[in-house]
Amino acid sequence: MLSFRIPRHTFPRLLQYALAVTPLFLAAAIVNTQSPPADSSSHSSSTAPPCIAFTFDDLPAHGPLPAGETRAEIATKILAALRDARVPPTYGFVNGATLESEPQDLPVLQAWRAAGNPLGSHTWSHMNLDQNSLEDFEANVTRNEPLLSKMMDNEDWHWFRFPYLAEGYAPAKHDGIRTFLAQHGYKIAGVTMSFADYLWNDSYGRCKAKGDNAAIAQLQSSYLAAADANIGFYRRLSHALYDRDIPYVLLMHIGAFDAEMLPRLLDLYRSRGFQFITLPEAERDPFYRNDIDPHLSSNPNTLEAAMAHRKLPLPPQPVPPAPLDTLCR
């Protein structure tokens, strides 16, 4: 990362590339990074626990649907885990186009709202800004609005998450979409913690279909290990930059394996000292000011980009230890 303008989607794509071409390296890539750097002296880190807002993309459906399960059942598992862990209202980001081909999945959105959780926009069809014109992307965002307005009634649905975290690599497109979002009252849902949870859902579907419980146990272990390692990775970046923990926003997906693992994942974050907060609470922090008001410059819009801007060395990001693409094939 050599420039100041670094699109958010760079890191998931690099992670997928590494996963595909270096499976032997990946097995040794996760390191114990759960503690902040030793030279951190911020009083805030010693007096206040780290906070995190969970968010879920791709509602109402993400990834393969294992045999015998429904999308509504996946959502029910996720909602139950959030409720049992006393997680405050949690934004789910919607692709309305899914309901055209799978109208039976509308209960997912209804259950999300009935549980007191808000919805935001993920575009109508999960459109990639970098692969489409600005005009087509804007129309795709607008097309999602009637569904969100209906589902949210008088509550705030003007939160937007870029599909693929692609915010427009070309400066004109990048600036153009931020102007559009600002003019239409949107706030951008940032991402300051992720462990590429979506990578496990395909493998889980295959392994469950084969009844390979040993492989599923491997997936469970590597999923939690990746989450734990990335807790340390992002906390180190925050402490290197600001000598404190910013309130983190975690990117998740409404996948079958995510639903299976969410109770244990929430336990992991709590065991690491995290308190759960809402997305609006997290983005009150000054770090997110350019996402709350997209009229402002978006740089830096991630912890990685902030590190690059400050010319601070970026440690290797942990990546999953298992060859997920080939498991249970």
Q: Would you name each region that the model predicts?
A:
Residues 28-41:
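Signal peptide processing junction and immediate N-terminal pro/mature segment
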Residues 17-29:
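Bacterial N-terminal signal peptides
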Residues 66-67, 101, 127-151, 170-184, ...:
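Alpha-helical scaffold elements lining the catalytic groove of polysaccharide deacetylases
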Residues 118-121, 147-152, 212-232, 300-327:
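Short, basic, helix/turn surface patches
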Residues 84-86, 100, 190, 244, ...:
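C-terminal domain-boundary segment and adjacent tail
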Residues 107-108, 176-177, 264-265:
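A short acidic, amphipathic alpha-helical/loop segment
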Residues 42-165, 250-251, 268:
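Active-site beta->alpha N-cap acidic-glycine motif
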Residues 1-12:
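N-terminal secretory signal peptides that target proteins for export/translocation
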